[in-house]
C-alpha cells in the first residue's frame, strides 16, 4: 500500500463511532448522527454488471445501495466501504457508465439531476478507492471483532445464570 494512502486513513478518527455490540446498524446510526445526515440502507436487486455498493448523496440524506442477496458479512463489507468514503470526506462524483437503470431501481424518488452526483466506482484503481477500501476493511474487521466479543460476553453471562 502506498504511504500516502496509509497516512490518509490513519488520520481518520472513527473509533468513537464503533459500537461495542459490533452491530452494523448501530454503526450506521452513529455515523449518521456524527454527520448530521440520515443514512438509509437500500438492499435492491442489482444487475450483474452493477457495482456491488453505491453511495448516493442527496441534499440532507445519504443512501447506501447494496445487493439484496448479500449475506451479513458481504453487506457489512459493502456498507463499511461506503461509510469509509463518508468518513474520509470523499465527494460523490459522477460515474463513468450509464447509471439510469440503477438509479431508477435504487431511488426512483431522487431527481435525475441529483442522481448525477452519485458516488459510483468500479475497481480499486485510484487513491480514493484504495483509501476507502483500507478504512472500510478496518471498520468491518473491528466491527466483526466487537460483535464476536459481545457475543462471548453474553454467552458467559447466560452460563453464569444457569
Listing of model-derived features with the role each one plays in the protein:
Residues 65, 79-82, 124, 161:
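Aromatic-enriched hydrophobic runs in primary sequence
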